[in-house]
Each structure stands twice: as structure tokens, then as C-alpha cells.
Amino acid sequence: MKIFEKIFVILIFVIGIIYVGRDLWGIKFSHYPGDKYDTRFNNVILEHNYRFFRGIEKSYLSAKFFYPAKKSIAGSDHHLFPSLIYSFLRLCGLDMFYSFSLWVLILFLLNYFSSFYILNKSGIDFFLSGIGAFLFSFSLPIMAQTMHIQTLYIFPIPFIFYFLQKFFETNKYKYFLKFFIFFLILYYTSPYFSCLILIPLFFFTITSIIINKEKFLKYIYKDIFLKLITIIVFFILILPFYLVYTKTGDFWGKGHIIKNLPSFIAYMVPFHGSFLYKNFSLYFWKFQTDPWHKEYSFGLITSSILFFYIFKGIKFRDLFPYIITIFLTILIFTKIGNFSLYSFILEIKIFRKAQAVWRYYHILLFPIIFSSLKSIQRYTLNFKLRNFIYIFLLISVLIENFPLRNSMKNTPILEIKNAHKDLEEVVKLKRKKEHKCFVVILPDSLKGKNIKVDLVSTMIVYQNLNFPTINGYTTFSPKGYNMWDEPTWQDVINWLKYNGWEDEKIESKVLKIYFDGEKYY
């Protein structure tokens, strides 16, 4: 690239970081991206992985929360692959909270430059590739999910689609292998995305086979042995996590999942978060349950331009699989009233593990961006006002995706660093040699008073003191566990008896820490 092109690409990245950074980290990097619960829980999982790599934790799957349950890590996204980045930051001497904050910044960097690389490698010029990378990394749909940091880990997705397309176009084994490598990377990070991506990949594969039918049938047996070995190794590598994931916790009901799907209007109108639409978008809230989480629009103008050129691009052979995938996937995941075609997908029970199905759109971002920008480039190739269209698109993207102040959650990092300290001091003070674990509970008299135990703090204390906790926080709790916001001693007894503990062992081996809403004792 020429020097101007490099400056432009970096400048767009810096603008994106400013957009998300003023809320997530603050000007002085004094804030923690997210809240004290979901976000800090992801931090705990990354810390567990780091501790396992260091040899502090003896089991990867069985972290010592929800004690004495086994395979507690499988209750949510396990972050195995991205924890390598986090672990490097920890080894550099940063504490778990600053490591996490910097890790989030690196995720944005990975998303931006990986998507830019694939877009540009696919023949899209640097200007449109920069715009596309911005939309993939910093647009409203991404900002709407920043409290759920695990949804930011999407950098493998452009590679997955790119290598799958290249395989069907060339029938070369190297693309087949690279597709499975990047799918494995995604799988070792997020069961959510690796499950939901199966639907668009199914449509993409079927469409690609149809349009490349003659070539596909001619070379179907080429490198067949290597392909079979690759598939077998892939399934061997995913099977342990898959079996644990399906057997942990309960499955969501169909009605609960369908309720969380988006309506069609979500794809065009920003519901929340855009400075430009801060008053206009409120009118449309009544059309969508929990609208901020169903933010799929890049802005009314930007979305209109992108989908207009997606429609126009359907005549291009290389874009056809992407475009069919986009519309069929949207059709599957979008509800009309209380009905959605996704209800038929839910007959496959593994899909009931995904409650937050609205996150599927993160997977579809790349196909939408790729096919629309490729179409724009082709239709404006000999157009005199091409530069005007490019600049207009850039301006609309930057203005429509400029976020409202405080539209993304953050917490002062000192508050995060101190949130568990009082509990940790009490546990250290009361701990005795005979104790095998600790639990934070409410006095019976406070049950039903809406006093919530900070469950994530109990997990951090367990990690700091290497002292197992019966408390825990995750998407899917272990079977038999019923100790969430207002746990009492009877809940503890029920849980431990479910795991085969006798009364005497329960009384002697468990350190009880009470919480009255203000202090631990």
C-alpha cells in the first residue's frame, strides 16, 4: 500500500478506538470495560485459563467454583484460544484487571485488521476495505454488545468464510485445511458462535456446491484421504468440549428463545446508541423486546446503501453464496409477531443452549460487509462520481455510528479492583485447616429482601486464595445447583447432599460467610 493508504487505514482504526474507548476505558484508561458481573465473570474465566497454563490449576474444565461440581468451565464461553493473549499480558506483570482491559483493546485491533486483510485480499480497494473493517469492528451492532465481551471475539469469521469460498472455487486442500483451523479457533473460544455459525455455513456450502457443481463433482475425490483425516482430527478435537457443553445445565425453552429474536425493523433503524438517532429511534422501541441488544442497524442511510448494493450484487457469481446466505439466515432468525422459522431449528436440541440468539448477527456482519462493498466497487468502477460515493459512504458510516455518551457500560477500575477485597479479608480471617471450601450466604431472615450476593467476587477470592467456593456465576449452572442471588444455608445443604456429602462433613468442612447487604461476617 502507498503511504496515504496506510495512513487512512490506521486513521479509521484510531477513530474507531476513540468511538468505543471514551466509554469503555476513559481518556486516562481509568475505567474497566463493562460491569462487575458479566464482564468480570469473563475476566475470571481468562484468569482460570492463565492459572491452568501456569500449573496452578490442575484441571482445565473443573475450576473450583460451584464446588464440588466437576467441569464447571463448560457452563459458558471458555475463551481458551484468546486466553493466550491474556496470559501473555499477565506474564508481562499486569494484574488481572488491567490485563483484561488491554486484552479487550487487542480484540478490537484483531477484528479490525483481520477483516481489513481479508477484504483487501479479496480484491476490495483499501478505501472500502477500511470502511468495511470499521463496520466489522466499531459499528452500532458491535457497540451494543460490549458489555458481553465474549461477543467481540469475531476475528476468525472473515477467515472462515474466505477459505470456504476459496476451497469451492479452487478445490485446493490448503483452503480446506485453513477453513477447519479457523473454525477450530472460533470453537475454542465461543460455543455460542461456533454453534450459531453452522446455520449460515450450511446455506453458504449448499449454494457454493450448486454454483460450482461441475468442478466440485470433478474434484470431489481429490486429496480425499487428507480431507477425511482433517475432518476426523477436527471432530476428535471438538468432541470433549461438545460432550461437556451439552451435558451441563438445562436447555432453554423455545418460547424464551423466540422472544429474544429481532424484528425486521431492527436491521434498518438504530434502536439506541447512535448520537444522530437519539430521539428518532425511541419511537421504534415498541416494536422490539430489549431493543439495545437487538441493534443490527449501521444507521438508516448506511444500511440502505449496503442492502441496496447487496440486492444489485446477486448477479455476480462469487457474491451469490454470500447474498443467499445473508437473506436466508436473516429469514431464519427474525420473528414476525411470536413466530420465527428458528423454532424449527430448535428441534435440534443443541441450539437450545444458546439463549442470546440475537448475537448471531455478529456472524453475519462479514458476509453483509463483504458482498455490499464488493458490489459497490464493481458498479462504480467506471462511474465519474465514484469518489463522491465513497466519501459519502464514509461520512454516513462515521456520523451514523458515532455513539451516544455513556451508551456503553464501564466501571471505574479502582471499584473493580476493590470489589472483592472485603470478602477476601473475612475469608482469610475465618479460614481454618479443616475447611475444604467456603460459601457466601444470607441469614435466613433476609431471604426475599432482594439482597444479592456478589457471586463473581467469590470466584475471584477463590482464585486469589486458592480456596474453593460453593458459589459461582455462569450461563448454565451444574445440575442440581440452585444458589443464585439469595443463597441460604439450607440451599448449601441441599446442593452438597445432591453431591453425596453427609451432614457431619457439611458442618465441619464448609466455611460459612454471611452477607447482610452491607458487610461480610
Feature names for model-found ranges:
Residues 228-232, 319, 370, 374-402:
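Signature aromatic-anchored transmembrane alpha helix within multi-pass, membrane-resident enzymes
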Residues 103-118, 122, 127-209, 227, ...:
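Membrane-embedded helix bundles of polyisoprenyl
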Residues 399-521:
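Extracytoplasmic
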Residues 36-41, 237-308:
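Periplasmic/ER-lumenal interhelical loops and adjacent helix-loop junctions
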Residues 298-331:
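Hydrophobic, aromatic-rich transmembrane alpha-helices
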Residues 18-25, 52-57, 128-146, 236-249, ...:
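Membrane-interface helix-loop junctions at the exits of transmembrane helices
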Residues 1-25, 220-233, 317-322, 521:
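Start-transfer (signal-anchor) and selected internal transmembrane alpha helices
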Residues 16-111, 139-144, 148-153, 261-285, ...:
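Membrane-interface coil-to-helix junctions
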